[in-house]
């Protein structure tokens, strides 16, 4: 077989696969709120409508990172969690290794090629909250999530937040029936083109 006949892959595709080191469960909670999710790949996107808890999740992690002993927020994870934001994102990112990095929407740098290049050279996992398309980043549609809430607001019960896939992984399979295939082979068009 000719070497040129094999499909080629972009380095960004390899980054998505090569740095997948396993699953990481993350639990972020207070007495009233709880987020529990599992990261399967190094890049996870959270999308959804306003008031679904996306920014609250990032705020809770920021509170924990900035003041771990003085906050009611508890973060349970096998990796350290960080929040990267603002105009100093490059400097923040350069000091983070083998961690889970959360980035909230409104940070314009997430849409840049510079950001995409930088994160592909790291060993971090990234959770990005955004409503925008991120064409420079190689992420899987299987890792785009929304946040669903169970429990009631306005009560003393803990509200439990879980991630759900926005794009399903179900595939549609339809077998070709032999009579359709046979009739197509006998059509005048097929006979002329044969």
Pin down the residues of each PLM region.
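Sensor-1/coupling segment of RecA-like P-loop NTPase cores
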Residues: 119-148
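N-terminal pre-Walker A segment at the start of P-loop NTPase domains
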Residues: 15-35, 155-170
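Short, small-residue-biased leader/transition segments that mark boundaries at the very start
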Residues: 4-11, 181-186, 193
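Conserved P-loop NTPase "ATPase switch" module shared by AAA+ and STAND
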Residues: 89-113
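Conserved lysine of the Walker
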Residues: 54
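Post-Walker A alpha-helix
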Residues: 57-59
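The conserved Walker
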Residues: 50
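A short helix-turn-beta junction within AAA+ P-loop NTPase domains corresponding to the substrate/partner-engaging
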Residues: 139-164
């Amino acid at each position: 077989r000719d070497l040129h006949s094999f499909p080629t892959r972009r380095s960004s595709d390899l980054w998505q696969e090569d740095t997948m080191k396993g699953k990481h469960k993350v639990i972020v909670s207070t007495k009233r709120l709880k987020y529990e999710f599992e990261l399967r790949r190094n890049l996870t996107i959270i999308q959804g409508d306003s008031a679904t808890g996306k920014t609250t999740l990032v705020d809770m992690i920021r509170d924990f990172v900035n003041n771990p002993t003085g906050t009611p927020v508890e973060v349970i994870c096998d990796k350290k969690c960080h929040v990267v934001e603002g105009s100093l994102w490059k400097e923040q990112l350069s000091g983070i290794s083998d961690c889970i990095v959360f980035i909230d929407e409104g940070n314009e740098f997430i849409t840049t090629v510079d950001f995409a290049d930088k994160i592909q050279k790291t060993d971090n996992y990234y959770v990005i909250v955004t409503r925008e398309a991120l064409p420079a980043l190689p992420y899987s549609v299987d890792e785009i999530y929304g946040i669903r809430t169970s429990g009631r607001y306005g009560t003393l019960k803990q509200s439990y937040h879980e991630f759900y896939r926005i794009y399903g992984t179900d595939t549609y399979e339809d077998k070709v029936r032999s009579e359709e295939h046979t009739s197509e082979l006998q059509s005048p068009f097929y006979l002329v083109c044969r």
